[in-house]
Amino acid sequence: MKYRRFGKTELEMPVFSCGGMRYQHKWSDIEWSEVPDEGQKNLEATIHRSVELGINHIETARGYGSSEMQLGPVLKQFPRKKLIVQTKVAPFATTREFLDNFNTSMDYLQLDHVELLS
């Protein structure tokens, strides 16, 4: 895999990313029991193969429905330093609303930080 420096940071980004818009089972928050086993296994295999190929930038968003929730258990299977995780949170009228949504993302992703937030 080829990597490029991300802007003026020291972050080495793969030239390909693993985008999470289509990871979700639904475009809304759902209960874990609603996620089909086959779909979750496919997501897990996709992420494992991506990381195996050097595609370690995993991108998702709060607005991608169940994507973050489904990614959380998969991301835990990798050494944290091996991944570059990015999520996105829409702007809100208040700081409290923004933080509530960001914290929901972090809870679903089962992470204590993300490398990139947009």
Question: What is each model feature region?
Answer:
Residues 78, 82-99:
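Structural motif corresponding to the early beta-alpha repeats
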Residues 55, 86-88, 115-118:
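Short beta-strands and strand-loop turn motifs
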Residues 70-73, 88, 97-104:
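Generic beta-strand or strand-like secondary-structure segments
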Residues 27-35, 48, 93-118:
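Glycine/proline-rich, positively charged
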Residues 22, 62-64, 89-93, 118:
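Active-site-proximal loop/turn and secondary-structure-junction residues that shape catalytic pockets
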Residues 1-83:
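N-terminal binding-site loop/beta-alpha segment at the start of enzyme catalytic domains
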